[in-house]
């Protein structure tokens, strides 16, 4: 009996570690928290594309900024005039060697059409993520907390 319990513990250890490690990733569904209201503002699904870099798409939006359109009228690239729902707002980014941090990509604010460099850092065991948008240096940016959506 002791041998089978020990075997179960030894065999399940790697599975539990793999599950915990998988959570320390930006992949999955996230909801940004609106700074003004403190409420969720959207659902964004982050996956990897064929190149192995991050891609994030808005699945749903709940809060629209005053005067904002359901389309990205202020975008200056291929997203100009396209609906924000279903829009790819995260492009690029890879995991830094030896760290649970993803960088090198861009994130779009569809309310004003501005694009920023972005850094993703899972926190709280992967239940939350710090998303830092910046121009130039990460020190010159703004961090928003996103919450993982379990579905």
Listing of model-derived features with the role each one plays in the protein:
Residues 118-122, 136-137:
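Exposed beta-sheet edge/beta-hairpin loop segments within beta-rich domains
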Residues 7-15:
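Bacterial N-terminal signal peptides
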Residues 50, 123-125:
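Structural motif
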Residues 27, 32-118:
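Central antiparallel beta-sheet cores of small beta-barrel/beta-sandwich binding domains
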Residues 1-4:
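Positively charged n-region of N-terminal signal peptides that target proteins for export
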Residues 24, 40, 140:
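Exposed loop/turn and edge beta-strand positions of beta-sandwich/beta-sheet ligand-binding modules
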Residues 126-128, 134-151:
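Edge beta-strand at a domain terminus
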Residues 18-29:
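N-terminal helix-cap/turn-to-beta initiation motif at the start of protein domains
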